[in-house]
């Protein structure tokens, strides 16, 4: 387990040079200041790294989706404009067809074309 609160571990992590960073459902649990710090760290230290994140979004949600958002423990579920401002270094797209029920997620990505990959995958499984 790598505790990034320890400065020695940050140096170790920087030497590791990951080629893929995946943040699954965590951004909506973190305030804007923390996300901006993480984004700066990724941009400055891992600019060539593949990046992918997925989080719920407030965006014309269905009734069930709205209820799930209200019950979510994440205090920072944002709308598309808030995410656009906060995640401006990354590409993004919103989907509502990943799960069997209608539930909107926003994907942020960098250094690969996730949207094209996703659309091709959806065609293949249809």
Sequence positions of predicted segments:
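Class I (Rossmann-like) S-adenosyl-L-methionine-dependent methyltransferase catalytic domain
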Residues: 1-12, 30, 34, 51-126
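Glycine-rich phosphate-binding loop signature in dinucleotide/nucleotide-binding domains
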Residues: 13-17
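A conserved beta-strand element that flanks and buttresses the S-adenosyl-L-methionine
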Residues: 22
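Short catalytic micro-motifs in class I SAM-dependent methyltransferases
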Residues: 25-29
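A short glycine-rich, Lys/Arg-flanked "PGG" loop and its adjoining helix->strand segment in the class I
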Residues: 36-49
């Amino acid at each position: 387990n790598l505790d990034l609160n320890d400065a020695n571990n940050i140096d170790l992590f920087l030497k590791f040079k990951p080629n893929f960073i995946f943040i699954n459902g965590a951004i909506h649990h973190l305030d804007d200041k923390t996300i901006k710090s993480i984004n700066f760290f990724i941009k400055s230290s891992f600019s060539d790294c593949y990046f992918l994140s997925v989080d719920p979004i407030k965006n014309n949600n269905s009734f069930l989706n709205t209820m799930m958002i209200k019950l979510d423990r994440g205090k920072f579920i944002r709308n598309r404009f808030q995410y656009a401002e906060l995640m401006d270094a990354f590409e993004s797209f919103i989907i509502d067809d990943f799960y069997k029920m209608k539930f909107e997620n926003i994907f942020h990505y960098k250094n690969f074309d996730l949207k094209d990959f996703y659309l091709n995958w959806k065609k293949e499984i249809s």
